[in-house]
Amino acid sequence: MATLQESEVKVDGEQKLSKNELKRRLKAEKKLAEKEAKQKELSEKQLNQTASAPNHTADNGVGAEEETLDPNQYYKIRSQAVQQLKVTGEDPYPHKFHVDISLTQFIQEYSHLQPGDHLTDVTLKVAGRIHAKRASGGKLIFYDLRGEGVKLQVMANSRNYKSEEEFVHINNKLRRGDIIGVEGNPGKTKKGELSIIPQEITLLSPCLHMLPHLHFGLKDKETRYRQRYLDLILNDFVRQKFIVRSKIITYIRSFLDELGFLEIETPMMNIIPGGAVAKPFITYHNELDMNLYMRIAPELYHKMLVVGGIDRVYEIGRQFRNEGIDLTHNPEFTTCEFYMAYADYHDLMEITEKMLSGMVKSITGSYKITYHPDGPEGQAYEVDFTPPFRRISMVEELEKALGVKLPETSLFETEETRKILDDICVAKAVECPPPRTTARLLDKLVGEFLEVTCISPTFICDHPQIMSPLAKWHRSKEGLTERFELFVMKKEICNAYTELNDPVRQRQLFEEQAKAKAAGDDEAMFIDENFCTALEYGLPPTAGWGMGIDRLTMFLTDSNNIKEVLLFPAMKPEDKKETAATTETPESTEASPSV
């Protein structure tokens, strides 16, 4: 048992250490020195092997010793090996390799082969990335070749090469992560593994970095999002998510094209940021010597085109909002918006039900999907896209949820109503950052008491006019508009309304928005004189609709983070502390029909 009288040793004339502590430190230093010596010896061994042509067969290691190096050492050795190939006249980056058949097609075409089959009369060329390399004795090497989301085994046998030296030379220079081309015959091993049996393997592009093993995978989210290429190499489920995203966009295009809509493109930089209540990004145009705003929504341009006689238009593209980043928000995001002359919001509800229910059935095979809002380990929810979707009236349902009678909707623009809503938020502990306008207070209450009830698709309808400066007034309920938002799993994915086409009323609402902006609401709209002038030429009865592609993709891929469905999400620089993922973002109280 150690005692306080344990003898001490002075180190560098300063700190006093016990003999046990000194012994521990000396042992640790010795162990570190041995490790460094071993790595140095291994590095020199690999460099020597690189500098001279190998004259022995590959052993079971097949470069496995290199896997024990730290990443920097591995990169150095691999880079020098590739440079040596260039010196000896071997091009590690050839211009072209003709591929006869994809890996997927190869598997479909030859999976019927029997164990032990070898089609020597069929020669094909395939290509892919090496994910595993393993030797069986000195004359047989297996590779796992991956690409297109599938795996094909390469069974390299020395007897199929011109000489054993050629077999050794070709296979000794290949490592995990390399992209190779393989020319050979289809076959199956005795155990029934479909393989291509090569006559020749060509290095097409070496991987200079140590590739993580598939067994362990790439799980660190920071690395996955910043190095999406590596994420795609190692995680096939990521590839599948973006395939689903592509299918969603393809389905929407096909659906709208069949309804006679024309796909259009509108400016992404604007003098005035219109079409939604949101904070814009500002850029500068050198030639024009003026600030421009990245678009927050394309709505106003679309309605101008309807004025011009293009009755059905749609656009799938990026929007930019200078707001926070969280699990469901990214500063740039993708929407689909369409505008349909001679239609109202009732028509668009039917179109929305038909589009989304058909899409979900087409992509997943069922109207019902399972979603985990808190991640794979969290609670699972069943989301049912079977039409018709649930519909609720915003103000009526809010009164039921709050257990209070709100002022008449015709009085929602008064200070008295604002004060009542303010008091309710205080009493219900609902946070609303300033400015505490009627529209913002209503939006927070709806989020707290109505949106949380929307698991399966639910239309929240008939928003107050004060929340919807671009929507047409309700034909039978004063103070309300003909607008709906579609919520799924408590999140808005669609926004639509019968469009306001009275130029006088539109100008009045723009002026009210200008007052809100002057009062400190930096998300309020600007007055767009060009749009008001266009309305004066006559906008036919029109309905407009917008949907967030990113959020819909989250639901259909069971992803609870928007970064999972964006190939290259917004990230803070690595030298800054990453806090963006936890930032709370106020939901926009109105929108173009965009999310």
From Swiss-Prot:
The modification N-acetylalanine is found at A2. It is found in: Cytoplasm, Cytosol; Cytoplasm; Nucleus; Cell membrane. It catalyses: tRNA(Lys) + L-lysine + ATP = L-lysyl-tRNA(Lys) + AMP + diphosphate. GO terms for biological process: diadenosine tetraphosphate biosynthetic process; lysyl-tRNA aminoacylation. Residues 48-58 have a biased composition (Polar residues). ATP binds at R321, N322, E323, H329, N330, E492, I493, G548, I549, D550, R551. Keywords: Acetylation, Aminoacyl-tRNA synthetase, ATP-binding, Cell membrane, Cytoplasm, Ligase, Membrane, Nucleotide-binding, Nucleus, Phosphoprotein, Protein biosynthesis, Secreted, Transferase. Residues 580-595 have a biased composition (Low complexity). GO terms for molecular function: ATP binding; ATP:ADP adenylyltransferase activity; lysine-tRNA ligase activity; nucleic acid binding; scaffold protein binding. Phosphorylated on a serine residue after mast cell stimulation with immunoglobulin E (IgE). The modification Phosphoserine is found at S205, S393, S588, S592, S594. Catalyzes the specific attachment of an amino acid to its cognate tRNA in a 2 step reaction: the amino acid (AA) is first activated by ATP to form AA-AMP and then transferred to the acceptor end of the tRNA. When secreted, acts as a signaling molecule that induces immune response through the activation of monocyte/macrophages. Catalyzes the synthesis of the signaling molecule diadenosine tetraphosphate (Ap4A), and thereby mediates disruption of the complex between HINT1 and MITF and the concomitant activation of MITF transcriptional activity. Homodimer. Part of the multisynthetase complex (MSC), a multisubunit complex that groups tRNA ligases for Arg (RARS), Asp (DARS), Gln (QARS), Ile (IARS), Leu (LARS), Lys (KARS), Met (MARS) the bifunctional ligase for Glu and Pro (EPRS) and the auxiliary subunits AIMP1/p43, AIMP2/p38 and EEF1E1/p18. Interacts with AIMP2 (via N-terminus) and MITF. Interacts with TARSL2. It is likely that the same gene provides both this cytoplasmic isoform and an additional mitochondrial isoform. Shares a bidirectional promoter with Terf2ip/Rap1. The N-terminal domain (1-65) is a functional tRNA-binding domain and is involved in the interaction with DARS, but has a repulsive role in the binding to EEF1A1. A central domain (208-259) is involved in homodimerization. The C-terminal domain (452-597) is not required for interaction with AIMP2. Belongs to the class-II aminoacyl-tRNA synthetase family. This is Lysine--tRNA ligase. It comes from Mus musculus. The gene is Kars1.
